[in-house]
Amino acid sequence: MYVFKALAGIVLALVATLAHAERIRDLTSVQGVRENSLIGYGLVVGLDGTGDQTTQTPFTTQTLNNMLSQLGITVPTGTNMQLKNVAAVMVTASYPPFARQGQTIDVVVSSMGNAKSLRGGTLLMTPLKGVDSQVYALAQGNILVGGVGASAGGSSVQVNQLNGGRITNGAIIERELPTQFGAGNTINLQLNDEDFTMAQQITDAINRARGYGSATALDARTVQVRVPSGNSSQVRFLADIQNMEVNVTPQDAKVVINSRTGSVVMNREVTLDSCAVAQGNLSVTVNRQLNVNQPNTPFGGGQTVVTPQTQIDLRQSGGSLQSVRSSANLNSVVRALNALGATPMDLMSILQSMQSAGCLRAKLEII
């Protein structure tokens, strides 16, 4: 009996070290409480000669003519305006949940013409619309550009992006979105990642605190919670629920590969079984030279001919089998993979082959 209790205590201690508590607010979001995208088209003025070349971007000139017409200024027909201080831009913003009229939000300004830089520019009043073509905000202000660049004598240097910037609190909410919050007797909590175990643990935690039947797990991502009627009551109820803590079990073993950048990221649950790996390097070198052949005798009537000479060299190196030991934790996995001496691009192929052979104990996701 004493031996059994001791073993049970050891098992519980191990489980406690594997699981850790997190708040429900960090694991879920409230269904329907989300941001909405806004977009608009406008003009940026005040650029130091780095704006659109209006002869190549006719929409910039057309927009400027329309704006001046609305301000009571008529541009003579046929006028060829060659401006350098104006740029056509797209303006985007996120409409936050529960936004009220008069509230300010940040906007992102991006050049859509051939402007060289938006540094020092001012965005003129731009209406921001939603997917329903209704205007929800008005944007205007000075643009903050994080990049810097300089050019002289045909040489140039640039740090970061110059054709995009941000205006902090650059838009004012003019129209409020209707919300259904507080109208019903149930609210759905959406898990950030689908997990049947986590959905059931959140359900059990709410039922223990609020009584049986207060929460129901609908699927691996949705937990439905019964709430009192009224906005203020639901706000207090959700505030209490979101601060509850639940034990988070170890996540699924996963390896994420970015095929564009060659980066490989894996979590701590990844393990390896013993296997042997042979990775050969194949290199192709193409050398092309242009030879100029001229006639030997001057004035002989011959022609100068340019003939290309191409040389292709194909080499293959490596390919010897290397043993990969069984690894039970992330540090061991890293050491085992580093021992192969493979580049990140080679490592992508190796991990795919390991999974096909059943040696990689993890899900493989390629983005």
Swiss-Prot record:
One of its GO terms (cellular component) is bacterial-type flagellum basal body, distal rod, P ring. Residues 1-21 form the signal peptide. Coiled coil: none annotated. The keyword Signal applies. Keywords: Bacterial flagellum, Periplasm, Signal. HAMAP family: FlgI (MF_00416). The gene is flgI. It is found in: Periplasm; Bacterial flagellum basal body. Belongs to the FlgI family. It holds the Pfam family FlgI. The basal body constitutes a major portion of the flagellar organelle and consists of four rings (L,P,S, and M) mounted on a central rod. It comes from Salmonella choleraesuis (strain SC-B67). This is Flagellar P-ring protein. GO terms for biological process: bacterial-type flagellum-dependent cell motility. Assembles around the rod to form the L-ring and probably protects the motor/basal body from shearing forces during rotation. The keyword Ribosomal protein does not apply. One of its GO terms (molecular function) is structural molecule activity.
